[in-house]
Amino acid sequence: MTNKLGRLDPKTGQFKEYPLAEGKNSGPHGLVADREGNIWFTANFGGYIGKLDPRTGKVTQYPMPSEKADDPHTAVFDANGILWFTVQGGNMVGRLNPKTGKIDLREVPNESALPYGIQINSKGVPIFCELGTNKMASINPQTMAITEYKLPESVRPRRLAITADDIVYFTDFKSGHLGTLNTTTGAVRLYPSPGGAESNPYGITITPDGMVWYSESGVKPNTIVQFDPKSEKFSRANIPSGGGVVRNMVATPDGHIYIACSGVDKVGVISPK
């Protein structure tokens, strides 16, 4: 790892790199932009949340208030500008107030939960995956009380995306499913992924037209899968470079999908038809 953040200009295909703190590799893992254009990232090896100002290159560090929380993992902003994040090995979920720099942490009830992907629903409630268990969970944004939702025993959820009407889609990394969770009723549905039980579904997103997209990282080459919630039909295509494990992906407002091909040093884009 190079201890840098990278910026891609989609119009030119040019990259610009921003070096982070000197010395120990901070292990930048998840990142998200705020409304002012700052880039916030989880220093998975450094035990802090970082903020990069791309205009100046300045990096501000917000250290974790607990030594146990040494591996912040995935981050997301809610509508109020609060940054929520998972701490995988530390088994916690946290929130950071950018105005004050204050960080609050809450331990997940199951000590082997391995909190992973996290997203915010339309009501402002963070929902996250427990990769180490067969559970999803939500955290009350005011009290930080955690509610868990049990999934079938074989399931290990890794990442998630949420529809406009708050249906949670998640990738079942262990047993090869695309799943849905209704957090109001607790109802769960599983759809076998086209690549089979060892397809290791991973990164996932939902485009503005309601289509669900995710990657299968256990097949070679990696695939991109489209799921239509209305017809419940799948479409599937290989990633030309092989993918090298697509750990995350994001949909833009105009329907493009950017994928991080972590093992082949590439960023890919899927254009709408």
Indicate residue ranges for each PLM-predicted region.
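Short loop/turn segments that connect beta-strands within beta-propeller blades
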Residues: 9-13, 53-57, 97-101, 140-144, ...
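A short beta-strand motif characteristic of beta-propeller blades
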Residues: 14-20, 58-64, 102-108, 145-150, ...
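Beta-rich, blade/repeat-based domains predominating
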Residues: 23-36, 67-80, 110-123, 129, ...
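Conserved beta-strand positions in repeat-built beta-propeller and related beta-rich domains
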Residues: 1, 39-45, 83-89, 126-132, ...
